[in-house]
UniProtKB/Swiss-Prot annotation:
Pathway annotation: Isoprenoid biosynthesis; isopentenyl diphosphate biosynthesis via DXP pathway; isopentenyl diphosphate from 1-deoxy-D-xylulose 5-phosphate: step 1/6
Residue positions binding Mn(2+): 156, 158, 239
UniProt cofactor(s): Mg(2+); Mn(2+)
GN (gene name): dxr
Source organism of the structure: Synechococcus sp. (strain CC9902)
UniProt-listed InterPro entries: DXP_reductoisomerase (IPR003821), DXP_reductoisomerase_C (IPR013644), DXP_reductoisomerase_N (IPR013512), DXPR_C (IPR026877), DXPR_C_sf (IPR036169), NAD(P)-bd_dom_sf (IPR036291)
Gene Ontology MF terms: 1-deoxy-D-xylulose-5-phosphate reductoisomerase activity; manganese ion binding; NADPH binding
Catalyses which reaction(s): 2-C-methyl-D-erythritol 4-phosphate + NADP(+) = 1-deoxy-D-xylulose 5-phosphate + NADPH + H(+)
Function: Catalyzes the NADPH-dependent rearrangement and reduction of 1-deoxy-D-xylulose-5-phosphate (DXP) to 2-C-methyl-D-erythritol 4-phosphate (MEP).
GO biological process terms held by the UniProt record: isopentenyl diphosphate biosynthetic process, methylerythritol 4-phosphate pathway involved in terpenoid biosynthetic process
Official protein name in the record: 1-deoxy-D-xylulose 5-phosphate reductoisomerase
Length: 417
């Protein structure tokens, strides 16, 4: 039975991971959980899974969590009360918890960077759903992986698809995603994208896009932030950078293809020009399960793919004029160094401002581009962790100040990186 820690247990990835644990009680057990502010759901998870440790991102909420557990009927309380910790240090304790064999990193955004690094430094295998870890800090994370021997297993559908395709090659042992060096025999990656909430909209109509429009995904059930990223195609741009670090390909050999049906989750072209693809219904539990069970596969009762039911699969190239965030991500990835961290932080803050209805949907790429342009003179090619954290905070502050002024440019001197 594999012992797992779930970082971000009350979020989309976390709840689906725990559903899998429920489906396979003889295969997995939960030893640690971390959460944000959803204490009601966390209490239910503690009751059901009885972890050894629980960590809250906000340490101030620990007394309330303890009160909620103490208020339970004695018959509903966990057999043994878990150890409870809080704050950033508490998250890192959960990420490196001694009895955990695999850590599922479901914390959204750059907030997941330090806990993920803690898991890597502790030598834990990771089911990586927090793509921002590699995007913002790939130059920092990859050397740590080499030192610790941790294995990265991608928990998002696209990179899981690539990983699964590579398991069938003679070089499967090199596809463990722990070095960042080019994967032998791999010529090209094609990341498929649903096109998001606005795939059938004209570019001119995006001026009228609302938060409700942007958070209504046609195929996938995801959190609000990632659903907005899907609508702007920033999510796919971030995945391009992640694929660059995971599989070692140059950006010119990583492509995005709009595939509205979301049946093909990604494709790889090998050196002999053959193309391998992984197919399935759009269900995040499938790539998460593969992370948990790898290198084995577990039989499931889940819905099986019937291509005659699908009927047809269609593909088209994304329009860069409609999806400027995609182009910004490619540019940041090619610039390298601290630029992806700035781009990612600016996007996270811009999306947060959009969800609060302080800016319009089309303002998101404007503020991201402004932050990236302002950072160019201070770009660091080979950053350390402190450098990444510093530029991350600078970009967030710059976007907030820009939005508060209602300007389209980020004024003032850049914070030295």
């Amino acid at each position: 039975m594999k012992a797992i820690s779930v970082l971000g247990s009350t979020g989309s990835i976390g709840t689906q991971t725990l559903q899998i644990v429920d489906d396979f009680p003889d295969q997995f057990r939960v030893v640690a959980l971390t959460a944000g502010r959803n204490l009601a759901l966390l209490v239910e998870q503690i009751q059901r899974h009885q972890p050894e440790l629980v960590a809250l991102a906000d340490e101030a909420l620990l007394p309330e969590l303890k009160q909620r557990l103490e208020a339970l009927d004695p018959s509903d309380r966990p057999a043994q009360c878990p150890e409870m910790v809080g704050g950033p240090d508490g998250l890192e304790v959960a990420a490196s918890w001694g009895s955990a064999e695999l850590v599922v990193t479901g914390i959204v955004g750059c907030a997941g960077l330090l806990p993920t690094l803690a898991a890597v430094r502790a030598g834990k295998d990771l089911a990586l759903a927090n793509k921002e870890t590699l995007i913002a800090a790939g130059p920092v994370v990859l050397p740590e992986l080499k030192k610790s021997g941790s294995r990265l297993l991608p928990a998002d559908s696209e990179h899981s698809a690539i990983f699964q395709c590579l398991q069938g090659t003679p070089w499967a042992d090199t596809a463990r995603l722990s070095t960042g060096v080019p994967t032998p025999g791999l010529r090209r990656i094609q990341l498929t994208a649903s096109g998001g909430a606005f795939r059938d909209w004209n570019a001119a109509d995006l001026e009228k896009a609302t938060v409700a429009d942007a958070t209504s995904h046609p195929n996938w059930s995801m959190g609000r932030k990632i659903t907005v990223d899907s609508a702007s195609l920033m999510n796919k741009g971030l995945e391009v950078i992640e694929a660059h670090y995971l599989f070692g390909l140059d950006y010119d050999h990583i492509e995005i293809v709009i595939h509205p049906q979301s049946i093909i989750h990604s494709m790889v072209e090998m050196a002999d020009s053959s193309v391998l693809a992984q197919l399935g219904w759009p269900d995040m539990k499938l790539p998460i399960l593969y992370c948990l069970s790898w290198p084995s596969r577990l039989e499931t009762p889940w819905r099986r793919l019937d291509l005659t039911e699908v009927g047809q699969l269609s593909f088209r190239a994304p329009d860069p004029n409609k999806y400027p965030c995609m182009e910004l991500a490619y540019a940041a990835g090619r610039a390298g160094g601290t630029m992806p961290a700035v781009m990612n932080a600016a996007n996270e803050e811009a999306v947060a401002q959009f969800l609060e209805e302080r800016i319009h949907f089309l303002d998101i790429p404007e503020v991201i581009e402004a932050a990236c342009e302002r950072h160019k003179p201070d770009l660091m090619a080979h950053p350390q962790l402190d450098d990444v954290l510093e530029v991350d905070q600078w970009a967030r502050t710059a976007v907030r100040e820009q939005v508060s002024r209602g300007t389209t440019r980020i004024p003032g001197p850049a914070v030295a990186a």
